[in-house]
A protein has these predicted regions:
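Intrinsically disordered/low-complexity terminal segments and short unstructured peptides
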Residues: 6, 21, 67-69
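Cell-envelope and extracellular/periplasmic
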Residues: 28-221
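Bacterial N-terminal signal peptides
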Residues: 12-22
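Bacterial N-terminal signal peptides that target proteins for export
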Residues: 2-13
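Sec/Tat signal peptide C-region and signal peptidase I cleavage site
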Residues: 23-27
Length: 221
């Protein structure tokens, strides 16, 4: 093989590798920010899992505890749940209802989400009275707040952003579930904080708060 032919072969291989790499990147499954490490799922209700991928791509979902399928209300999870992305790249599937517990692992193709709990999930929506953070009430409840931590209570704060062109289909990538620790507590909704504490003391199961509050906004927002 002469040098010119050899260089052509190398160039062809390089182009092929680039195309394969691009295909792999495009085919990567993406989950919404709500479905992420540390999330809390609603107990004893069917659980929807959704996301995006290349049109026609097969998506496999496993829900695990200690590398084995966990028990669920009324039976056991199947080893694998599957879905296929539609022509717009959208896919979804439903897991069966589960009892409270955790932590669990959720595997979606090559994505692995850890530290997942099953308990009660509450939407904390409203105006400034719901938005008011714990940091604003520490003068009145300093001792109580500084003495309490509970990683079975978690909050996801929906950021105050808006889109005047179309409804939002996802949250920014930086949005994450945060456990109730001294590091995170000041950003919890104060009303949500005391409510979650009371609910945990009553039921002794994980509590998830989705804090979607914004002062001065109407309820339809």
């Amino acid at each position: 093989m002469n040098q010119v032919s050899f260089n052509k072969v190398r160039l062809s291989l390089a182009v092929l590798l680039c195309l394969c790499a691009t295909s792999m990147v495009n085919a990567k499954v993406k989950l919404p920010a709500l479905i992420s490490d540390g999330m809390v799922l609603q107990r004893e209700q069917p659980i929807k899992v959704w996301g995006t991928a290349d049109a026609g791509e097969s998506v496999q979902v496993k829900f695990l505890k200690n590398a084995t399928p966990t028990g669920v209300k009324g039976g056991k999870l199947k080893a694998t749940y599957t879905a296929t992305a539609d022509e717009n790249g959208q896919w979804s599937l439903t897991l069966p209802a589960m009892k409270p517990g955790g932590p669990y692992i959720l595997q979606v193709n090559d994505i692995e989400l850890k530290d997942i709990l099953v308990g009660d999930v509450w939407l904390c929506s409203g105006q400034s009275n719901m938005e008011l953070p714990v940091s604003r009430v520490t003068d009145m409840f300093r001792d109580e707040i500084s003495a309490y931590e509970n990683t079975n209570i978690r909050q996801l704060k929906v950021p105050n952003i808006f889109n005047f062109h179309a409804p939002q289909t996802d949250l920014p990538d930086y949005v994450a579930w945060k456990p109730l620790t001294q590091e995170n507590v000041m950003n919890f909704s104060a009303l949500g904080y005391f409510f979650a504490k009371a609910m945990y003391e009553k039921n002794n199961i994980p509590v998830g708060l989705i804090n979607s509050s914004w002062g001065g906004t109407p309820v339809e927002a």
